[in-house]
């Protein structure tokens, strides 16, 4: 008998080329206390002038021409033109904006460990609470500080750390 013809061999299937995806690197979770901004190593003055028209009094009373009495001056008054832009001294986050009968319109910005109170600003705030700001960003304009209205135009700047008042000039210049 003659051999039976065999069926042609089945071709061996060629596996389809695969592209192996790189496994995604797992990002560590962001800690709850992570800052929302990069903390600035250096600070700038918030107005064009570094001239102080009334210094921080470190708890000692100084005479107030407007109020006609002796009182502690908890901030530093920097000479500025009315309408001049007020700039953030460093990167930070706006904690609040409000109007105070003595300080006028106030923007509070957290700059690292410090809270800066920019006082006597125009009625139109240029920033909002929880907004992240960069050093040099305009946050308001100079107008008047009601409790210091007899003084020449200026920005009243206060700095606090853990609720304690500090000399703004020392903080800006890196002394504290």
Predicted regions and their residues:
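Cationic-aromatic interfacial patches
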Residues: 1-18
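Short glycine/threonine/proline-enriched tight-turn/helix- or strand-capping micro-motif at secondary-structure
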Residues: 32-34, 57-87
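Extracytoplasmic
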Residues: 38-40, 47-51, 63, 71-75, ...
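Residue-level recognition of beta-strand microenvironments
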Residues: 55, 97-98, 121, 142-145
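Short, well-structured beta-strand-loop connectors
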Residues: 85-94, 126-142
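Zn2+-dependent peptidoglycan hydrolase active-site motif and core
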Residues: 88-123
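Short, acidic/hydrophobic/Gly-rich beta-strand patch recurrent on exposed beta strands
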Residues: 66-68, 77-79, 106-111, 158
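Conserved, short, structured surface segments that act as functional micro-motifs
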Residues: 131-176
């Amino acid at each position: 008998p003659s051999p039976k013809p065999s069926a042609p061999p089945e071709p061996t299937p060629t596996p389809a080329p695969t592209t192996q995806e790189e496994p995604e690197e797992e990002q560590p979770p962001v800690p709850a206390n992570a800052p929302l901004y990069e903390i600035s190593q250096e600070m700038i003055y918030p107005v064009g002038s570094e001239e102080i028209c009334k210094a921080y009094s470190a708890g000692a009373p100084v005479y107030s021409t407007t109020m006609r009495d002796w009182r502690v001056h908890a901030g530093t008054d920097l000479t500025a033109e009315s309408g001049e832009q007020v700039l953030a001294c460093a990167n930070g986050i706006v904690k609040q904006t409000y109007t105070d009968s003595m300080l006028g319109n106030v923007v509070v910005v957290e700059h690292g460990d410090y809270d800066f109170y920019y006082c006597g600003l125009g009625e139109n705030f240029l920033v909002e609470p929880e907004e992240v700001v960069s050093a040099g960003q305009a946050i308001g304009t100079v107008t008047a500080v009601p409790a210091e209205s007899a003084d020449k135009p200026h920005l009243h700047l206060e700095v606090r750390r853990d609720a304690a008042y500090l000399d703004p000039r020392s903080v800006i210049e890196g002394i504290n």
